[in-house]
């Protein structure tokens, strides 16, 4: 029988939210164990575009919303971690771009200008022209306008690698997770037959929270899934582009990020409105055809004749909302010794950790003495989606 363990905080779910929380708690002196059933970052995290949103895209058609205000400070907090004064040490993690951009095709430039003239938005953006344009927009055929946002874009696989480093010896690969009770109280979890006692158990497993709650005999908090149908384009002719393209609706028409591949080429990863409801309803062939049409209209000077195409379906797991709306903040619920949450967005991982740390403080949960952990089976790092799709 595997050796029983004792720790302060037991975390289930090794995506960026769980790994970030784990690193924050360890830095604060807590003993932790983080359990992952598959690969680190392999759920939603590694399928993220890596944009640390500051909320500009949520304010595209009117006043700043709750969503844009809640998320406004996130780029500053993440950027601080790349230096010496952040809440975590992410020095050396690869940034794909120092800025994300917003561009409008010719016909919509006027509405974009008036939007960015508003006082609420002015401090977050600046117009880009000439050599300051993203390389993919530096063409005489580009007739629109582009604005540089104060949002950074991380290489997500490299971010996951660094957060796994910060976890030290606290990571545990474990598939079968059952409640460990003392009387009626949750005392910890039994992971593949190994008892792990903890002062608090945190579920941060994204879509996996639903099954974990069921295993613990709980129906609340309820979860919703908002699906996406993303598109990947691989070609030697691609130029770097990290940008939202403005459409007529409240969501970006298309959101493009550029990712290096192991064979020295690049992949454009396409989200935004194309990946939402209509895109979800399309099969792979129809979704690729739609992406081809959109890129031919928006960026006709980019040669995609030899490009490879693939799609990827992703479920965004979140606390249930009325009308399947997008939650504005990270979410955390408490039931006795159990904390359950979703960051709801990559950029809000620090907000999720804030909420857990605040709850521990309120409940008087302090770091305590525990025996050193033995060598534990360690979960692997997730493979980037494009390396799998274009293998």
UniProtKB/Swiss-Prot annotation:
An example molecular function term from Gene Ontology annotations: FAD binding
Pfam families registered for this protein in UniProt: DAO
UniProt entry keywords in alphabetical sequence: FAD, Flavoprotein, Oxidoreductase
Enzyme class: oxidoreductase
Annotated protein name in UniProt: Probable FAD-dependent oxidoreductase PA4991
Family: Belongs to the DAO family.
Binding positions (FAD): 17, 36, 44-45, 49-51, 346-347
Purpose: Probably functions as a FAD-dependent oxidoreductase, whose physiological substrate is unknown. Does not display amino-acid oxidase or glycerol-3-phosphate dehydrogenase activities. Is essential for growth of P.aeruginosa in the sputum of cystic fibrosis patients.
Any GO CC annotation of this UniProt entry: cytoplasm
Oligomer status and interactors: Monomer.
Cofactors, names only: FAD
Cofactor stoichiometry and binding remark: Binds 1 FAD per subunit.
């Amino acid at each position: 029988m595997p050796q029983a363990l004792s720790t302060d905080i037991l975390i289930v779910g090794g995506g960026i939210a769980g790994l970030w929380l784990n690193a924050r708690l360890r830095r604060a002196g807590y003993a932790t164990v983080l359990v992952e059933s598959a690969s680190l970052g392999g759920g939603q995290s590694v399928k993220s575009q890596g944009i640390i949103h500051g909320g500009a895209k949520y304010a595209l058609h009117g006043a700043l919303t709750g969503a844009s205000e809640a998320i406004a400070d996130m780029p500053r907090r993440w950027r601080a971690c790349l230096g010496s004064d952040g809440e975590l040490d992410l020095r050396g993690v690869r940034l794909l771009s120092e800025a994300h951009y917003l561009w409008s095709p010719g016909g919509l430039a006027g509405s974009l200008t008036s939007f960015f003239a508003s006082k609420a938005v002015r401090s977050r953006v600046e117009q880009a022209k000439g050599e300051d344009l993203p390389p993919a927009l530096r063409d005489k055929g580009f007739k629109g306008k582009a604005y540089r946002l104060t949002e950074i874009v991380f290489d997500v696989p490299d971010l996951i690698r660094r957060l796994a480093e910060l976890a030290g010896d606290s990571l545990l690969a474990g598939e079968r997770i059952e409640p460990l009770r003392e009387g009626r109280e949750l005392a910890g979890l039994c992971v593949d037959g190994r008892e792990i006692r903890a002062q608090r158990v945190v579920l941060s497993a994204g879509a996996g929270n639903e099954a974990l709650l069921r295993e613990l005999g709980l129906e609340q908090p309820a979860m919703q899934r908002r699906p996406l149908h993303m598109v990947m384009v691989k070609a030697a002719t691609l130029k770097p582009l990290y940008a939202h393209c403005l459409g007529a609706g409240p969501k970006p028409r298309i959101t493009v990020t550029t990712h290096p591949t192991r064979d020295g080429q690049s992949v454009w990863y396409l989200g935004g409105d194309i990946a939402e409801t209509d895109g979800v309803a399309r099969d792979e062939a129809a979704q690729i055809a739609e992406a081809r049409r959109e890129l031919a209209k928006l960026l006709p000077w980019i040669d995609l004749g030899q490009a490879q195409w693939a799609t990827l379906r992703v479920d965004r797991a979140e606390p249930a909302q009325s009308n399947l709306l997008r939650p504005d903040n990270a979410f955390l619920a408490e039931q006795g010794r159990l904390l359950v949450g979703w960051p709801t967005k990559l950029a809000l991982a620090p907000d999720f950790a804030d909420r857990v740390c605040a709850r521990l403080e309120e409940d008087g949960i302090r770091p305590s003495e525990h025996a050193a952990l033995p060598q534990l089976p360690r979960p692997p790092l997730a493979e980037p989606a494009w390396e799998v799709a274009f293998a």
